[in-house]
Amino acid sequence: MPDQITLQIDGRPVTVRAGATIRDAIDAAGSETPTLCYDPDLTPPSACRICVVEVKGSRALVPSCSRIAEDGMEVSTDSPRVRRARKGVIELLESSVDTSLAPTIQRFAERYEARPERYAGGATVAQPVRESDNWLYVRDYARCILCYKCVEACGSDVQHTFALTAAGRGFDAHIDTGFDVPLGESPCVYCGNCVAVCPTGALMGRTEFEMRQAGTWDEPKQTETETICSYCGVGCGLQLHIQDNRIVKVSSPRDNPVTHGFLCVKGRFGYEYLHGGSERQRKRLAGSGSRESAPVGMRTTESS
């Protein structure tokens, strides 16, 4: 088997390693294809279908994120058929899901002249915002597009916790904790890596959620500072998002050689202790029931 193959991307020859995906070839050609469920560090679920391309001789459009490229393949990334398919996917998403916090989808909607009002009235199962689940992040499934990134990040690709899974079919499809148990009774370790990969704001850190609710979240005003987490000796790289001299969010650069963008509960959410935590968080930590549901390693201890 040859080490490299050559195919055509929009009429241009491109050489890539054998086993590369069509998306890899598109990137090598310097072209762009839209994606929603794709993440370079996660297994492609081929769920969103917005990255589909047309392959000469193929009856159906194929997902470029997971389809393996073949020698001699001729690929069209922006044919009329491809554009119609992408437009339809975006219209269906925007007609049934709140995408107001998903600028990527809005940008694609403008690019493909999507008209979601054509499908007005349809809606996915909108599970409620579960503010009482935990004090670290909020789940708002009315914004969920079922990209499955959170499931992949929680599973064997990153965390190996397997607290999240996909459940239901059709309009009943949703992300579940497994038998719909409360989050505190699931294997969740509150690392927040599901939050980090969510493209729509369906999963959001509590500080950001509360600031958005209060109208004080101002991303253009925020500055970013890179540092190293001091909770242990691993040396994870942190990116502190600062607004009004307060840390409002912590992430990790995706190109960081230690984390690859993923953190543990202490690295992602431990910053609250720098500010003493919110009053509600302190009460929850001090409460008899909430303290037990707090992540291990961040529970408060009672003084004797």
What function would you assign to each model-found segment?
Residues 2-19, 27, 55-57, 72-96, ...:
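N-terminal export/assembly segments and adjacent metallocofactor-ligating motifs
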